[in-house]
Amino acid sequence: MSEGTTTGTQEFWEGFYQDRDQIWTGKPNPLLVREAASLDPGTALDLGCGEGADAVWLAGLGWRVTAVDVSSTALRRAAVHAEQAGVGERIVFAEHDLAQSFPDGEFDLVSAQFFHSPVAQDDERTKVLRRAAEAVGIGGVLLIAGHAGWPSFIEDRHDVHFPTMDEVLDGLALGADWSVETKDAVEREITGPEGQVGLRTDTVLRLRRVR
């Protein structure tokens, strides 16, 4: 399904995924695993699902997942991954440019893992995250993981703004209906595409809608 995609955004991410047969490892994001493993399964929305590793992991735990991405190539790979993992019936894949369209419904978990885009402005990201918060049902969780900066081995650092956790929270402006359950920065060792080894700091917010 394709709804309201912006040509520049779609072209960028299609090119990104078509450049190689597989971009990601096929494993779920560690911060998702850390923060969601203890949650009771329900309905989940995976924003920018890519090749589907997070959605497949959630479905394997019993979640019913709506997984969206702007790239049809990524979604095809994600659907294959889900079928191979035996959880295809628990995941609905849908094509969305989230700046233009958003899945209907309320969810027990809305996950935005490393929701960064070189073809989107900070205000667009904030608008999407606000819409993500609106999609969380009472008692549900909004989980946002992001990069705090460049990997240590990157020397040519482009002028990119990595929002801080406080900036994300200020942009969401959630108010008294929400509680902050996790606000954490995690340094991890990573390996770059050319075998470089270094450190990168990621941030994670787990926010619960209490009423």
Feature names for model-found ranges:
Residues 55-98:
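Class I SAM-dependent methyltransferase SAM/SAH-binding core
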Residues 1-39, 42-50:
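Conserved class I S-adenosyl-L-methionine
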Residues 118-131:
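A short, conserved alpha-helix within the catalytic core of class I
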Residues 111-113:
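A conserved beta-strand element that flanks and buttresses the S-adenosyl-L-methionine
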Residues 139-147:
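Conserved beta-strand signature within the Rossmann-like core of class I S-adenosyl-L-methionine
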Residues 102-109:
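A short acidic, Gly/Pro-enriched loop at the edge of an enzyme's catalytic core
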Residues 155-177:
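Conserved Class I S-adenosyl-L-methionine
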